[in-house]
Amino acid sequence: MTWNYRVMNRGGHLAVYPVYYDESGNIHGRSEIPFSPEADNLEELRTTLELMLDALTEEILEHESVPKQSS
């Protein structure tokens, strides 16, 4: 399973969420809450923020239309 960050609209508010895909590239699920970046060092934080910025180039998803990731 692969994943990336995607912007989601939830009640008129935009946030970045991790989104998970199945082997065919279809959306399989999302995290329950938006992602808040943390890192052990500046380079790690930079990499995470760059991945989050990539989400701004993708279509905005509606939060309600993407199922929560199951355990």
Regions found by a protein language model. Give the residues of each.
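Buried hydrophobic residues that stabilize the cores of well-folded domains
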Residues: 15, 19-22, 28-36, 42, ...
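Short N-terminal "domain-start" leader segments
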Residues: 1-24
